[in-house]
Amino acid sequence: MHVLDGSSGGGQLVRTALTCAAVSGESFRMRYVRRARSNPGLQAQHCAAVNAVADICDAATDGVEVGSEAFSFEPEVAAEEADDDEEPTLGGTTSVEVGTAGSIPLVFDSLLPLAGALDEPITATLTGGTDAKWAPPMDYFQHVKLPLLREHGIDATVSVDRRGFYPRGGGEATLTVEPSTPTPITLTERGDREALTAYSVAESSLADDEVAEQQATAAAPDAAHEIAYTDADSAGSAVVLAAEYEHSRAGFAALGERGVSADAVGENAADALAAFESGPGAVDSHLADQLVPVVAVAGGEVRAPEVTTHIETCVDLLAEFDYDIDIEHTDDGAVVLSA
């Protein structure tokens, strides 16, 4: 069993460990989970990720509860303990409540890298936050990350049944991942921008003030606009700029907050897009972080705007499972990740 140190990382480290264990069949125990965070230990969305992946690979777990700073994960043990004649399989159906506004897209992130190792499809239905703080909104997941992964052989789709905004959540979405043959993810050049779409969503009570329209216009007045109003348990809003380039994709998001105007929310997304396009990355920094475990199992080369703590800690953890990723710093400040 691998003994992993979770003190220097956050939820991304937990999700990466789950990916490695499910694909390799190797067990781990993680100690000092998120110790450097202001709220150390597992939080609700991390527990949801552990439980979802455990369902998919018949894992036995211990210590999976909110606040726990140590937990273990043993793939295929639950199937073996069932004492039947069926071989353990990777895939199946899971339904997990993330809790309040815990991020549904971040839990989905723990399942996507499994695509190339699946014996049968994954169908994962989660309830919680679709558009939550400190996480990519659902439109980023749906219109930036998934299209990029599909271009590289990962057959995954998501349906959103209900939006969930901070703080109450209450959203619901279902991810389907088919057994796939991923191709190496080679994203070293950005090229010219070929398309830009502003996806702007707000809870129905904000329609009279045209919050979604204002966000989209402030973010990108000349882009295509996809405007949506939706019933939800909490009032909230989000805007995502989905940019398509000659050789890559990137996304830039901002969430509505009490006391922040819709125009300011849109401008935050616009500023992030402008900063990215003035820099050297082929993908945005959030996508680069999330692609690390996918590159580890599928191979490839990704040019990120910068090396983040998420990248460094995940690369170190991947090495524990014999997945080697090289980090090359370039003269223009970018970093190239290759496997």
Curated annotation (Swiss-Prot):
Q: SUPFAM superfamilies, alphabetically? A: EPT/RTPC-like, RNA 3'-terminal phosphate cyclase, RPTC, insert domain
Q: What class of enzyme is it?
A: ligase
| EC number annotated for this UniProt entry | 6.5.1.4
Gene Ontology terms, cellular component aspect?
cytoplasm
InterPro entries linked: RNA3'-term_phos_cycl_insert, RNA3'_phos_cyclase_dom, RNA3'_phos_cyclase_dom_sf, RNA3'_term_phos_cyc, RNA3'_term_phos_cyc_type_1, RNA3'P_cycl/enolpyr_Trfase_a/b, RPTC_insert
**Where does this chain mainly localize?**
cytoplasm
Q: Give the gene that encodes this protein.
A: rtcA
* Active-site residues (renumbered): H310 (tele-amp-histidine intermediate)
Q: Which domain of life is it from?
A: Archaea
GO MF annotations in UniProt: ATP binding; RNA-3'-phosphate cyclase activity
Q: So what does this one do? A: Catalyzes the conversion of 3'-phosphate to a 2',3'-cyclic phosphodiester at the end of RNA. The mechanism of action of the enzyme occurs in 3 steps: (A) adenylation of the enzyme by ATP; (B) transfer of adenylate to an RNA-N3'P to produce RNA-N3'PP5'A; (C) and attack of the adjacent 2'-hydroxyl on the 3'-phosphorus in the diester linkage to produce the cyclic end product. The biological role of this enzyme is unknown but it is likely to function in some aspects of cellular RNA processing.
The Gene Ontology biological process annotation of the record reads: RNA processing
Name of the protein? RNA 3'-terminal phosphate cyclase
Q: Where in the cell is it found?
A: Cytoplasm
Which protein family is named in the record?
Answer: Belongs to the RNA 3'-terminal cyclase family. Type 1 subfamily.
Provide the residue positions that the database annotates as binding ATP.
Answer: D109, H286, L287, A288, D289, Q290
Pfam families with a match to the protein in the record: RTC, RTC_insert
Transmembrane regions listed in the UniProt entry = none
Q: Which reaction does it catalyse?
A: a 3'-end 3'-phospho-ribonucleotide-RNA + ATP = a 3'-end 2',3'-cyclophospho-ribonucleotide-RNA + AMP + diphosphate
Keywords recorded for this protein, A-Z: ATP-binding, Cytoplasm, Ligase, Nucleotide-binding
